[in-house]
């Protein structure tokens, strides 16, 4: 006769059913979306800046002649640096988008990737912000001029060129904000993984 005081093994196993999987956070999908937006913003800023070109017939002061003068992005080293930096940011954006997708598929390596993301995001933020500031400084002088050193405005003549440059800088500022958000999200995600 079997004792009724001891529970059988099958009932113990059924009572110790595995806990439901914890609800998966949306951080991974937000990472993917923000990184893709970084890629799109960087490429857009580069394309808009590269297409910044305009030719105008400008009168020569003191002479009764007019000559065609061209304004293009390649005339300024700051704009060339801007193109280079945002191109690197675009490449970084697509590579980290693919890495973030791999984290969604295999979350085992998430902490290691998040640490690298946080460090590289700060580095990219510095590069993009410095390039945006350099291009913005040149664009501001083109828009307002500088009477102290007798640099005249050029945006009153090359309006389409200045609109392209201004739009490109605005999109680059958006990319900088995205990098700030990505840095904060990566650090917060790492913080949440610290055992309490």
UniProtKB/Swiss-Prot annotation:
Membrane topology: Multi-pass membrane protein
Chain segments annotated as transmembrane: 30-50, 85-105, 113-133, 168-188
Keyword Transmembrane helix: yes
InterPro entries: CASP/CASPL, CASP_dom, CASPL
Segments on the Cytoplasmic side according to the record's topology features: 1-29, 106-112, 189-196
Source organism superkingdom: Eukaryota
One Pfam entry name: CASP_dom
Extracellular face of the membrane: 51-84, 134-167
Basic and acidic residues composition-biased segments: 1-18
Keywords assigned by UniProt, alphabetized: Cell membrane, Membrane, Transmembrane, Transmembrane helix
Subcellular location: Cell membrane
Region (Disordered): 1-22
GO cellular component, one term: plasma membrane
NCBIfam families (alphabetical): A_tha_TIGR01569
Subunit structure, as described in the record: Homodimer and heterodimers.
Recorded family membership: Belongs to the Casparian strip membrane proteins (CASP) family.
Record PANTHER family: CASP-LIKE PROTEIN 1U1
The protein's name: CASP-like protein 1D1
Taxonomic lineage from the root: Eukaryota, Viridiplantae, Streptophyta, Embryophyta, Tracheophyta
């Amino acid at each position: 006769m079997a004792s009724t005081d001891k529970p059988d093994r099958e009932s113990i196993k059924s009572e110790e059913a595995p806990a439901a999987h914890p609800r998966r956070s949306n951080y991974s999908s937000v990472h993917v979306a923000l990184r893709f937006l970084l890629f799109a913003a960087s490429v857009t800023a580069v394309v808009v800046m590269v297409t910044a070109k305009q030719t105008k017939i400008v009168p020569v002061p003191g002479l009764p002649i007019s000559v065609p003068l061209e304004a293009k992005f390649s005339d300024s080293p700051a704009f060339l640096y801007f193109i280079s930096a945002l191109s690197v940011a675009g490449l970084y954006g697509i590579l980290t988008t693919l890495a973030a997708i791999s984290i969604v598929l295999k979350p085992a390596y998430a902490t290691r990737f998040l640490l690298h993301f946080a460090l590289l995001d700060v580095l990219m933020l510095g590069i993009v912000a410095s390039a945006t500031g350099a291009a913005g400084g040149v664009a501001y002088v083109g828009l307002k001029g500088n009477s102290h050193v007798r640099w005249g405005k050029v945006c009153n003549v090359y309006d389409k060129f200045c609109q392209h440059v201004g739009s490109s800088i605005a999109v680059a500022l958006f990319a900088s904000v995205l990098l700030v958000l990505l840095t904060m999200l990566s650090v917060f995600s790492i913080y949440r993984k610290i055992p309490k």
